[in-house]
Amino acid sequence: MAVCTVYTIPTTTHLGSSFNQNNKQVFFNYKRSSSSNNTLFTTRPSYVITCSQQQTIVIGLAADSGCGKSTFMRRLTSVFGGAAEPPKGGNPDSNTLISDTTTVICLDDFHSLDRNGRKVEKVTALDPKANDFDLMYEQVKALKEGKAVDKPIYNHVSGLLDPPELIQPPKILVIEGLHPMYDARVRELLDFSIYLDISNEVKFAWKIQRDMKERGHSLESIKASIESRKPDFDAYIDPQKQHADVVIEVLPTELIPDDDEGKVLRVRMIQKEGVKFFNPVYLFDEGSTISWIPCGRKLTCSYPGIKFSYGPDTFYGNEVTVVEMDGMFDRLDELIYVESHLSNLSTKFYGEVTQQMLKHQNFPGSNNGTGFFQTIIGLKIRDLFEQLVASRSTATATAAKA
């Protein structure tokens, strides 16, 4: 769908690089007759019409820090083909990932306070006061309309706000971070939304692994960070899941009594009913309530085994469909047996979920429900993207005939 905007020439200077390869510009002069004998008129200021050739589709992914957003993004961008990489020639500490089809923006880049500023103001990064939602809304809206933006960068290494980077409008924009569904204006821009809901026990184990290994934080600082963030998480982050189209809930297993290691996970994919262009995945018989232990001749299962559940439910007053997996896969090549019993996967061919899982078998969560459901949601987003593009093309063609 083409999106057109009219500017006077004097006002276009502040747009900088917003005219890009996705835009077409038409220049013209505003003219007015200067006499009754139709003598040609005085030339007025020139104008430019900018028409984007596409409207970017926007996906929102919300979760607390250290909850697997980065891995999810790698799985998602892989579904569309091409590796997601930082902007070439840009800031080496950029949080942005770009592939042929997708651009992933980390919403930490819209922090209004750097690390020291938050200490001075005694607020966490989760507090809305530490974030610039006006700028977030303006830039996501601009990208959705096909305009490039100079997006700020929050440097996770130094804790400082770095100079901005140029972001061109992609086919699919993913905004991931703490607050993609917090501000109602930003929420309205989303075509689809996901919330990663990690239990406190699992979150602690994941955050230790990431922040100690990748960011060099001490165990004591991680514990202090979790405790200091919890009130703000409960107030500002957790409530966003009521707005999500899909919630991936990660819990300790129920297969091992009193398990406290957190190595085996129970993962629930909570899918909201009635979402346009999204048909919930189901197991065996749509609308039924099912419990299934697939271990046997076709699926190798070591202790404690694998259990699937499926059925309708309600979530924050919304009708939902829930698919649950508890346990771990021993052999990913056998996953196709499970895949064959699930419907509405939005695959292009038989075994595509299994192929994607095998392709990224070294990613965290590849042997449990986190990687399995993330892969499925990636395929569902691809299908949603294709349906949205087709519907907009149809609407444009219909409007042209009118």
Swiss-Prot record:
Known EC number: 2.7.1.19
GO cellular component: chloroplast; cytoplasm
Activity regulation details: Light regulated via thioredoxin by reversible oxidation/reduction of sulfhydryl/disulfide groups.
Keyword field: ATP-binding, Calvin cycle, Chloroplast, Disulfide bond, Kinase, Nucleotide-binding, Photosynthesis, Plastid, Transferase, Transit peptide
Subcellular location: Plastid, Chloroplast
Extent of the transit peptide: 1-51
Main location: plastid
Disulfide bonds listed in the record: C67-C106
Catalytic activity: D-ribulose 5-phosphate + ATP = D-ribulose 1,5-bisphosphate + ADP + H(+)
Pathway note: Carbohydrate biosynthesis; Calvin cycle
MF annotations from Gene Ontology: ATP binding; phosphoribulokinase activity
CDD domains: PRK (cd02026)
Annotated GO biological process: reductive pentose-phosphate cycle
Similarity remark: Belongs to the phosphoribulokinase family.
PANTHER family found in the cross-reference section: URIDINE KINASE
Database matches in NCBIfam families: PRK07429.1
Record-given protein name: Phosphoribulokinase, chloroplastic
